[in-house]
Amino acid sequence: MPEPAKAAPKKGSKKAVTKTAGKGGKKRKRTRKESYAIYVYKVLKQVHPDTGISSKAMGIMNSFVNDIFERIAGEASRLAHYNKRSTITSREIQTAVRLLLPGELAKHAVSEGTKAVTKYTSSK
């Protein structure tokens, strides 16, 4: 009777693996490579449970998320600077999203962001 297949490790999972050096016997930690892969994978499974993603596509999605993050953070930073504020709040993030994303996409992003902030503050 065939055994059930073990679940494949989540794509993008990061583990600090220790490697033993050749003659010295010293252990060296592998550097951690941070990525949004596990989160992209979770969202993919929520939207399309039967669909997979290639490592190349995952790399593109990771680059996309990093790019959008940097754009929003940069715009929020400028907004805070223009208004002589030293703190980036959810208001700056929301305004940055409205400035960067087009039309309907901005509306959906703002509503999802507001929902996430509300959920976070209510859980405290």
Swiss-Prot record:
Disordered: annotated span: 1-32
Phosphoserine carried by residues: 13
PTM annotation: Monoubiquitination of Lys-119 by the BRE1 gives a specific tag for epigenetic transcriptional activation and is also prerequisite for histone H3 'Lys-4' and 'Lys-79' methylation. Phosphorylated during apoptosis; which facilitates apoptotic chromatin condensation.
Basic residues bias spans: 8-17
Modified residues (N6-acetyllysine): 6, 11, 14, 19
Residues annotated as glycosylated: 111
SMART domains noted in UniProt: H2B
Keywords associated with the record: Acetylation, Chromosome, DNA-binding, Glycoprotein, Isopeptide bond, Nucleosome core, Nucleus, Phosphoprotein, Ubl conjugation
Highest taxon of source: Eukaryota
PROSITE patterns the UniProt entry points to: HISTONE_H2B
Gene3D superfamilies reported in the protein's UniProt record: Histone, subunit A
InterPro entries tied to this protein: Histone-fold, Histone_H2A/H2B/H3, Histone_H2B, HISTONE_H2B_site
GO MF annotations in UniProt: DNA binding; protein heterodimerization activity; structural constituent of chromatin
Crosslink site: Glycyl lysine isopeptide (Lys-Gly) (interchain with G-Cter in ubiquitin): 119
One CC-aspect GO term: nucleosome
Cellular compartments annotated: Nucleus; Chromosome
Coiled coil regions in record: none
Binding partners and assembly: The nucleosome is a histone octamer containing two molecules each of H2A, H2B, H3 and H4 assembled in one H3-H4 heterotetramer and two H2A-H2B heterodimers. The octamer wraps approximately 147 bp of DNA.
PANTHER family: HISTONE H2B
Primary role: Core component of nucleosome. Nucleosomes wrap and compact DNA into chromatin, limiting DNA accessibility to the cellular machineries which require DNA as a template. Histones thereby play a central role in transcription regulation, DNA repair, DNA replication and chromosomal stability. DNA accessibility is regulated via a complex set of post-translational modifications of histones, also called histone code, and nucleosome remodeling.
Family: Belongs to the histone H2B family.
Protein name (database record): Histone H2B 1/2
Organism: Danio rerio (Zebrafish)
